[in-house]
Amino acid sequence: MTQHSPAFVTPDWLEREQLTDTPTPVFFGWLFNQQSLTRRLDRLSDGGFDIVPLSEGWQALRDDECAALGLPAASEGWVREVYLRGNGENWVFARSVAARDALQHGGLHMDELGTRSLGALLFSDPAFDRGTLQVCHYPQSWLPDADAVSGLWARRSQFSRGALSVLVAEVFLPALWNAIHNKDHA
């Protein structure tokens, strides 16, 4: 489970039009691509893609997550944190959350995913609508210790189906950018 730092100010999640600190064109293309990240990573890794679960369970959601899901502060939800890996390297840290009430009545069993991709599940169900992508520099204190680096770009979006909403945040780790660079220059 990632660290909680109550003294840390919640980052500003910004939509494309609100960005003043614009990432490079390659970063921008990955951050705002609407396709399944799982599929893109699988292609980039030439089939060497896998998921490593880090933690999952019921816990109090972060303030920014509650606000995005329209919940009261400190609402409880299911939190799933995983690495999306390519060829044995951690490429993306992902944190997915859903409110307890919505999840228990929404027919999505996040607790049964194991090493399966939540993204693949969400993109295979046409009833899920994806909200607007937002980006930020993800707080270092919210990352697993092994990848706790400041200034990493992250994106998040909300997937909704009826009363069920799942907020998915994806932090792009340095090894991913290295893999993209190496593939572009191969």
From Swiss-Prot:
First-tier enzyme category under EC: lyase
Keyword Cytoplasm: yes
InterPro entries: Chorismate--pyruvate_lyase (IPR007440), Chorismate_lyase_/UTRA_dom_sf (IPR028978)
Binding locations of substrate: R80, L118, E170
EC number, as in UniProt: 4.1.3.40
Cell compartments where the protein resides: Cytoplasm
Listed GO biological process terms: pyruvate biosynthetic process; ubiquinone biosynthetic process
Name used for this protein in its record: Probable chorismate pyruvate-lyase
Record gene name: ubiC
